[in-house]
Amino acid sequence: MLSLDLHPLFRNNRDIELALRQFVFRAHHSGEPVAEIIPGKGTGQLQSRVLAFLGQKHMRKLYDRAEVDPHNTGRILVHFSRR
């Protein structure tokens, strides 16, 4: 499973967006059914930013669904269809 840990980037908005964009494109093209993004638990602000980023129309076209892991709220699972 592909994974992106955002802990080292949490203070720089531009780096976070770039890392997310590159990661989603890489995961989309990899053929993996699921990829994980780890914003951590913290205050939930980073997780909200990640979900808002994933909800943008141009990003939404790349995956089927995204969800907060029900067993670990510090992790977001992004599901891709195998087209």
Q: Which residue ranges define each predicted feature?
A:
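Long, charged, low-complexity intrinsically disordered regions
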Residues: 1-83
